[in-house]
């Protein structure tokens, strides 16, 4: 049993990215689907698909790279889990961080759902900072 399923998902994505895997499978949950939707919308992954397996299901995340086979370049430069089970990080609407001076994205879980830092500023809500990705 994992103590932090979101950190496990981010680590699987990071490891697949390092070795240029085509896709990576992670156990599914609603919050993981929401995070994948943000990663897809922001252009960090190509696509994701929910696969029913009779239990909780699997999310197959298709990775995204720039260039062709020999000259591939990673789209995801870094991905970091911020709020952890042992140390939660909550921010107000005025304290929402910018990642790499606006180049990266902070993923937050708010009362309005899982959103990016930009969306949270527009909505005027704060919440728990899940991860930074750039």
Curated annotation (Swiss-Prot):
Domain of life: Bacteria
InterPro entries attached to this UniProt entry: Ribosomal_uS8, Ribosomal_uS8_CS, Ribosomal_uS8_sf
GO molecular function: rRNA binding; structural constituent of ribosome
Gene3D superfamilies found in the cross-reference section: 3.30.1370.30, 3.30.1490.10
Keyword RNA-binding part of the UniProt annotation: yes
Spans through the membrane: none
GO cellular component: ribonucleoprotein complex; ribosome
Known function: One of the primary rRNA binding proteins, it binds directly to 16S rRNA central domain where it helps coordinate assembly of the platform of the 30S subunit.
Assembly, per entry: Part of the 30S ribosomal subunit. Contacts proteins S5 and S12.
Protein name: Small ribosomal subunit protein uS8
Source organism of this protein record: Pseudothermotoga lettingae (strain ATCC BAA-301 / DSM 14385 / NBRC 107922 / TMO) (Thermotoga lettingae)
């Amino acid at each position: 049993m994992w103590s932090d399923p979101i950190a496990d998902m981010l680590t699987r994505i990071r490891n697949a990215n390092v070795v240029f895997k085509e896709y990576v499978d992670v156990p599914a949950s609603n919050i993981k689907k929401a995070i994948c939707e943000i990663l897809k919308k922001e252009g960090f992954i190509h696509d994701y698909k929910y696969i029913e397996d009779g239990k909780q299901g699997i999310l197959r995340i298709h990775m995204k790279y720039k260039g062709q086979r020999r000259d591939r370049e990673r789209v995801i430069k870094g991905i970091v889990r911020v709020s952890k089970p042992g140390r939660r990080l909550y921010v107000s609407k005025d304290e929402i961080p910018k990642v790499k001076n606006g180049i990266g994205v902070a993923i937050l879980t708010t009362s309005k759902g899982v959103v990016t830092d930009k969306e949270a500023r527009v909505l005027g809500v704060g919440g728990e900072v899940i991860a930074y990705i750039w």
